Amino acid sequence: ISVDKTPIVDPDVGLNASIRIVNQQTVSKEKLLESGSATSEMLEFLTACIRYGVSVCIAGSTGSGKTTIMAWLLSQVPNNRRLITIEEGSREFDLVRRDENGRIANSVVHLLTRPHENPALNINQDFLLERVLRKHPDVIGVGEMRSAAESLAAAESSRTGHTVCTTIHSNSCASTYRRMMTLAKRKYMMSDEVLMQIMVEAYPIVVYTKQLEDRSRKIMEIIEGEGYEDGRLIYRSLYKYEVADNTIDENGEPHVVGRHRKGDD
């Protein structure tokens, strides 16, 4: 819940409140396919990435479906792998599985930040990331990268052999690496080239999600980052959603027509 009052808003307005409602229903592959968010091949590819040690960054704007895709992807981690999630503010992931007798069947730890005015008592995502590395995780889920410290800490976790899945606000797949770089640059005095190389190495796969005009949510593109040379990002588009037409029905409701295709189609 986010609330604003005067003097931020006009006195005659009173209070402005925004409530983020988390859907507690488990996201399934069938639901993602039914909604047209992705194809079966795309979801199987992302599952293989997480299961076999390839870190993934999911990008998009607010309400684009980043958290939904990430929650489903983390739910694909096998029961014998240790999964630790880090979230800021509120819990959105519930990935603990139980068997028919109610016993916990997988190895999952959910961690949450605890802001405090006293720096010694403040528990942020950067602090939790450092602690997580001592717990021998197979997969680390970072709710969202917002600061320089957690941006680089998450990247270094990936570069040291851990599988990381995280989200970030970005306008496209390709611009996601630069967004991560500019976040890290707020605190660390490294060149653009060094930071970009770190991010490309840390997150070989980037997924971009978007909410279209008809309010449907799609994975718009999946790319593989291959390198950064002479100020240019080198990448390969693996899957992409192409919009064929935008229509408006007799009730004034918009409809987007399109399809997912492989990068080499």
List each language-model region with its residue ranges:
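Conserved lysine of the Walker
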Residues: 66
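Flexible glycine-/small-residue-rich
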Residues: 5-7, 19-21, 87, 113, ...
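Hydrophobic anchor at the beta1->P-loop junction of P-loop NTPases
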Residues: 58-60
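Walker A (P-loop) phosphate-binding loop of P-loop NTPases
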Residues: 63
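Conserved P-loop NTPase
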Residues: 200-265
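P-loop NTP-binding catalytic core
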Residues: 1-52, 97
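Switch/coupling sub-region of P-loop NTPases
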Residues: 54-56, 72-201, 210-211
